């Protein structure tokens, strides 16, 4: 339960496209993620997605931004904890053909039955049915629009 007595919403699992946009300085995406955090929306960032995003731009700024995301109140980092999780991740890679960072996103979303938050839903469509539970994908359709704002909505169906 959340502090206001309502049910805590299912976490969003952030994919590499969202993290990369943030590290590249996309203010709209960063503001969107900060808005989710301010509203108490839980967010999960798989550790290997952080690795994938940090490969895009190798810099101290990128590292600082990724460390900053970890400090947000509603963000939790999903580590690759042990051999069992590593073997499960390998199975996801084998079943989907995804690279390790996207496969970690898929594995976390699959295990927790949480939606993947992405900038590229098309990238995920072919993998929606590859896992034990169908992946649910939410595409950020208009990153400059505040969550719950007017118009078509900041989140679009994946």
Regions found by a protein language model. Give the residues of each.
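Alpha-helix capping/helix-boundary segments
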Residues: 18-19, 49, 104-105, 122-124
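A short secondary-structure junction motif
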Residues: 19-28, 47-68, 90, 94-96
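Short beta-strand scaffold positions
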Residues: 45, 80, 100, 118-119
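Acidic catalytic patch
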Residues: 72-95
